[in-house]
């Protein structure tokens, strides 16, 4: 039987086009050392970039070949596509320099990669062969024990404690960005690497390479944006709890910190300070004079931070107008409610162009004019129940095709509002992230996690994963969020170990919903959402207070060091909290380390994250390292055994660095 070749390759100046029945694929240069591939079953490609920025630089592109085989090279990265045989054509191989890093894998014939969902949308799969010995890092944050993503799967969807940032860094020296906001899945398993969009018009991904992890991360930031300049005050200590029920409650705590001489730079006003969900203003019964409150806080050099929720219900004075103007997330079927919390709530549609100015006008009138410049963007996923994305209707499209965009536009809305008022020091505490949110000053935390040592261990890996996902501003609730018993020995130990981790996090923030104590007084019996247990550093016993006060004071001494590296993150994309392999990428051991990390280039921190633990093994990379407790100097490229009682932590400083003087 005669076999006819299937498909045709067209070579243009800076791209390759492959066409055959039910497939159109374009591979093109995109900035420096980067290739972009788009592929669809439809007859044409869309020019939709989602959150991708235009190329930051001109491409050094070279193309060659014919209708059967062609290659495109852009600096360090190249791709070769083969027209191939019927049903198995269109094979793509990607290279970093001369090393193959990705190779298309067929699991069944090629049309099986596109399964029709609705209209011109499909469930789309992009599958590559697995590489032996490869490590993957990134994919956002999730409370689990997997830092190296090799051998695992990841659902690409947001929920409380999970931000799906669909980007990975490979130990083979390249990055991969899945440019598709549809919920889906990523499998970096031992038999294949597969990216899935549950419902999309086209596949869209970028592959980029560099000499070092820092080079690769910089290209990612060229593609999606750099964090703005980090506000100096934000490098200090943040005080928070669920929740201060009134203006006076909050001011009492702020005054006590100042009275005790404890350095504090921010205090947080949590949810239900408002009149109703979707009204974005203080309840005057409990917050009678926000202007005076803000003046007093700023005189104490404490920044007020206010929680904003994107939820709204028919009781809100803004509901009718927003609903009629389609500024709310709608449902394809059934009632409007997508979240049950003090009644059925829906969410504002932050992807709608009118929503930003409408909500910002309310925020400006009810918060900004009083002196509030920093906002806590909670519920940023958004948290819908059940998670049936195809039933959600956004301005940007059906939820099955666009739901992952929500935290991007939520952050963008407040960033642009603040910029329009001339603000430059912008930081937004946000519960979810997506590629590009970092450029809006989004400080991500890992959500409502448990108050357990297991959650602390996971949080270390979470922070490192976010660093390799291009999110340099990250933090966690010191002590965890849920079920913390401040009277228990377990929690008293936990909060100290977590605070030690907090000192060496991009932001140090004490927060949580502590269990109420037996004799806790109801200060405001009629309040809708009452406070949990106390959560100030003096709330956990006298011995803990001494330790925690010392840690907060250490954080204050570290502020110049922290600000230096946060500035570098804004300029280069390099995070202050970074995996060991980020700087020591030629040391194979460093790719296996998931419970110690570098804090900038000069501090190595090894958290203690198990109950009763007072010692652990630490790997020191090349160079000479000073133990901050004993001041003993160790030579690197070896493991050392360290001890640290509860009042101590394990950290090393690179010999020759002046930062040793703050310890």
Spell out what each predicted region is:
Residues 228-392, 438:
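Aromatic-lined carbohydrate-binding/catalytic grooves of carbohydrate-active enzymes
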Residues 204-209, 234-247, 274-288, 340-360, ...:
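The substrate-binding groove and active-site-proximal loops of carbohydrate-active enzymes
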Residues 415-426, 433-445, 466-476, 481-663:
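Catalytic core of carbohydrate-active enzymes
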Residues 15, 34, 78, 166-167, ...:
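Beta-sheet entry/capping signal
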Residues 286-296, 302, 321-342, 395-411, ...:
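Acidic, His- and aromatic-enriched active-site or binding-groove loops in soluble protein domains
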